[in-house]
């Protein structure tokens, strides 16, 4: 199981870069330096919704309020699949340990 890191340009009116780290424990860490945002959220609290400029990544339960980040459809698709791969790796590891 590996930590995966990726950088996405947010598709907002004020573009910024979101540095995302997918932890093998099922957590997504997000840092947007331009907005002074940094948070960690469980994969179970991450949603993808169609937005006006692509897809919206919704991270629930972040300091009591959801955080929404606009991604291109391609970037959202890639992130979704990276999260699914991490989930599968974690499930395989847990089964092997049982």
Enumerate the predicted regions with their spans:
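Positively charged, low-complexity terminal tracts
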Residues: 1-98
């Amino acid at each position: 199981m590996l930590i995966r890191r990726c950088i996405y340009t947010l598709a907002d009116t004020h573009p910024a870069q979101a540095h995302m780290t997918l932890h093998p424990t099922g957590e997504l860490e997000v840092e947007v330096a331009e907005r002074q945002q940094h948070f960690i959220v469980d994969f179970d609290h991450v949603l993808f919704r169609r937005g006006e400029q692509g897809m919206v990544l919704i991270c629930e339960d972040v300091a009591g309020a959801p955080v929404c980040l606009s991604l291109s459809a391609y970037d959202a698709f890639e992130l979704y699949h990276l999260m699914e791969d991490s989930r599968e790796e974690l499930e395989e590891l847990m089964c092997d340990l049982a």
